[in-house]
């Protein structure tokens, strides 16, 4: 009996701390992403490729906005990852922040993409790309649109 109660408690705990039902976790995993964080207010998943790494974070809150995500990248996340914030620009669809840093393989470039509007109320996206190549703004705009199309397809 104790084992059954323990199992139910653990199972309910797992379900109560999961991403909202409107996020298609199965599709995220089928598309080759690894889910790194899945709790009541945050879902983070990543994908490593030879030429680019992608880290996506979804924040589930009614108190967020794109300006807060941009400010957090500049003041918290870029320094935390030893990246130097250099510039930002905006497209019709997103704000794109640029940074760079050094790792064991040389210089890396980080690009933080924050959509201007959310697909679903209370779900804010942040897409972070890491690559060894500096990308021109036009290419970054195309990459941002492609990434946002894919990520937003996971939101029902």
Task: Name what the model sees in each region.
Residues 38-42, 53-55, 103-113, 122-124:
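Short, surface-exposed coil-to-beta transition loops
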Residues 18-45, 82, 146-147, 151:
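N-terminal "mature-domain start" segment
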Residues 41-49, 93-99:
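Generic recognition of long tandem-repeat/solenoid scaffolds
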Residues 30-33, 127-156:
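Surface-exposed amphipathic alpha-helical segments
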């Amino acid at each position: 009996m104790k084992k059954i109660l323990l199992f139910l408690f653990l199972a309910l705990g797992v379900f109560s701390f999961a991403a909202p039902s409107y996020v298609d976790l199965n599709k995220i995993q089928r598309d080759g992403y690894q889910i790194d964080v899945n709790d009541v207010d945050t879902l983070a998943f990543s994908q490593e490729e030879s030429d680019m790494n992608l880290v996506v974070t979804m924040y589930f809150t009614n108190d967020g906005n794109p300006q807060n995500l941009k400010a957090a990248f500049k003041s918290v996340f870029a320094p935390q990852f030893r990246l130097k914030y250099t510039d930002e620009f905006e497209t019709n669809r997103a704000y794109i922040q640029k940074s760079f840093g050094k790792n064991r393989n040389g210089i890396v470039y980080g690009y933080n993409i924050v959509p201007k509007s959310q697909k679903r109320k209370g779900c804010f996206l942040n897409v972070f790309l890491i690559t060894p190549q500096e990308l021109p703004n036009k290419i970054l705009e195309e990459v941002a649109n492609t990434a946002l199309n894919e990520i937003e397809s996971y939101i029902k």
